[in-house]
């Protein structure tokens, strides 16, 4: 077993029981009782059972010195990035010495990512929209759409007039301002998020509009290949060595108008990943979690599940399983899709599920009960699991089954589930050592890059003052343990990660 998990908690419980009995069975002073309780909490915390070696202790001492200094300054000034909206805090995070260390840290894997939200939008604007044959149109609602075609794309009711972007840029007075306007349409970033996004409906509307806007750029075959490569490059530069991507596998098109199917897309993911590994031999690779939107009818989802079964049979090393994406609050519940989701089991076919569940503020509804239904349907991991702390029995069951939650703090904040990340419900789960991994969801749409920003928010905000190098190490190892890789692949990954970790520790401890 790569990392100690909940199956090994009985030994810890015995130790904690011994600690408890020591002060219940004897007359301890208040100070002694206090010390015992603090020790108990320390051991329960995520990573609390890890024993650091000498070098790690030295690195931890330096890291915590910087962290405590930054937090004390925040207490003095009341300017604390995790308590602020990410759009307003990002520049402060980038000044942080702790953040610089987190960027250096080998983070293992990113296990919760969406296909067209993971490459920085600046690349999309400065690179992709400057390529030949790129056209733009504006729908009657004023929403941008893009299409590569020669000579021009086919017109429709939504796009009655296409303009070659190269010609359009020649006509605008300020090209830089135009490109900046594209960036504003490709991300949620704004200087005044509380004013612009007054509620969850508003921010989700813009969020889903962005996917509609950029889809025509990314799903052009030459761009698609480059996009997949660029996504690996950006995460590799952020010291992430493996990615699992939720992908809807929408049709990819050629300049001629020809369209490719899901198999072509999966094969392209596979080929591009192999090409990337050739020049980055420590990179483990990528897997695809085929996904469909939870707004669709049951019959459509049933067909998507059959497609997922076929893709996994044909590409067992690439396709990890299936998920449902889209806003939970307005989409179908897992219970609605139960019959469709039972198709693989009834047919004797193994199709792993990686369900989004509990990405909501509401309690006692079919929405937050998605967490329960995800577990009943044998989900491998729980995407977000924001509502898990409100369901103690479900929480205990997921812990017993060793099913982790995928925590995406910046996404949860930007999409208005929580404003101050110190109040994120996963803080309670971290304090008790619940299985979890950290990921970044759609970092490009939030103006972020890679995984480091989310790690910063967790380490500084959600984990509180006591989260230290043990916490970070446990999270990195968890990302390997809970990945969809085979055990032999996890062992290889762990060896590569360990070498990088030791170098990172030496750098932090000595520089």
UniProtKB/Swiss-Prot annotation:
GO terms for biological process: adenosine catabolic process; inosine biosynthetic process. Pfam families: A_deaminase, A_deaminase_N. Residues 30-100 are annotated as: Dimerization. Its EC number is 3.5.4.4. Substrate binds at residues 115, 204-211, 293, 326, 442. Keywords: Disulfide bond, Glycoprotein, Heparin-binding, Hydrolase, Metal-binding, Secreted, Signal, Zinc. Residues 1-29 form the signal peptide. It is found in: Secreted. GO terms for cellular component: extracellular space. One of its GO terms (molecular function) is zinc ion binding. NCBIfam families: adm_rel (TIGR01431). This is Adenosine deaminase 2. It comes from Pongo abelii (Sumatran orangutan). The lineage of its organism: Eukaryota, Metazoa, Chordata, Craniata, Vertebrata.
């Amino acid at each position: 077993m790569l990392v100690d998990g909940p199956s090994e908690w009985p030994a810890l419980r015995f130790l904690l029981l011994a600690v408890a009995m020591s002060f219940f069975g004897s007359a301890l002073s208040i100070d002694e009782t206090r010390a015992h309780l603090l020790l108990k909490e320390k051991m329960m915390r995520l990573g609390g059972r890890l024993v650091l070696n000498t070098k790690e202790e030295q690195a931890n001492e330096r890291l915590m010195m910087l962290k405590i200094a930054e937090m004390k300054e925040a207490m003095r000034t009341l300017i604390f990035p995790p308590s602020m909206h990410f759009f307003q805090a990002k520049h402060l995070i980038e000044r942080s010495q702790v953040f610089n260390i987190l960027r250096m840290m080998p983070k293992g894997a990113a296990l919760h990512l969406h296909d067209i939200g993971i490459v920085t939008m600046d690349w999309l604007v400065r690179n992709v929209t400057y390529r030949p044959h790129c056209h733009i149109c504006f729908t009657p609602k004023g929403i941008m759409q893009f299409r590569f075609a020669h000579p021009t794309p086919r017109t429709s009711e939504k796009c009655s007039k296409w303009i070659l972007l190269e010609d359009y840029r020649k006509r605008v007075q300020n090209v830089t301002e135009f490109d900046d306007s594209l960036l504003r349409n490709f991300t949620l970033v704004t200087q005044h998020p509380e004013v612009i996004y007054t509620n969850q409906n508003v921010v989700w509307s813009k969020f889903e509009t962005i996917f509609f806007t950029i889809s025509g750029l990314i799903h052009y075959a030459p761009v698609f290949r480059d996009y997949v490569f660029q996504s690996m490059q950006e995460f590799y530069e952020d010291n992430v060595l493996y990615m699992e991507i939720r992908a809807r596998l929408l049709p990819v098109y050629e300049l001629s108008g020809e369209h490719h199917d899901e198999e072509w897309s999966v094969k392209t993911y596979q080929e591009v990943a192999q090409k990337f590994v050739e020049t980055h031999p420590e990179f483990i690779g990528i897997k695809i979690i085929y996904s469909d939107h939870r707004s669709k009818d049951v019959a459509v989802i049933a067909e998507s599940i059959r497609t997922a079964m076929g893709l996994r049979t044909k590409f067992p090393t690439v396709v990890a399983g299936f998920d449902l994406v889209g806003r939970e609050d307005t989409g179908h519940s897992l219970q609605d899709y139960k019959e469709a989701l039972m198709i693989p089991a009834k047919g004797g076919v193994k199709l792993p599920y990686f369900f989004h569940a509990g990405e909501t503020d509401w309690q006692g509804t079919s929405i937050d009960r998605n967490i329960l239904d995800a577990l009943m349907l044998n989900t491998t991991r729980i995407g977000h699991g924001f509502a898990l702390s409100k369901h103690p029995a479900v929480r205990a069951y997921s812990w017993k089954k060793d099913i982790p939650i995928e925590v995406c703090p910046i996404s949860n904040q930007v999409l208005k589930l929580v404003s101050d990340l110190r109040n994120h419900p996963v803080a309670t789960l971290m304090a008790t050592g619940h299985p979890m991994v950290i990921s970044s969801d759609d970092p490009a749409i939030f103006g972020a890059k890679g995984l480091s920003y989310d790690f910063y928010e967790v380490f500084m905000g959600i984990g509180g003052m006591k989260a230290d190098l043990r916490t970070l190490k446990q999270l990195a190892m968890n990302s390997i343990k809970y990945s969809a890789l085979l055990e032999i692949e996890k062992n290889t990954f762990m060896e590569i990660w360990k070498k990088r970790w030791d170098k990172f520790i030496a750098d932090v401890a000595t520089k």
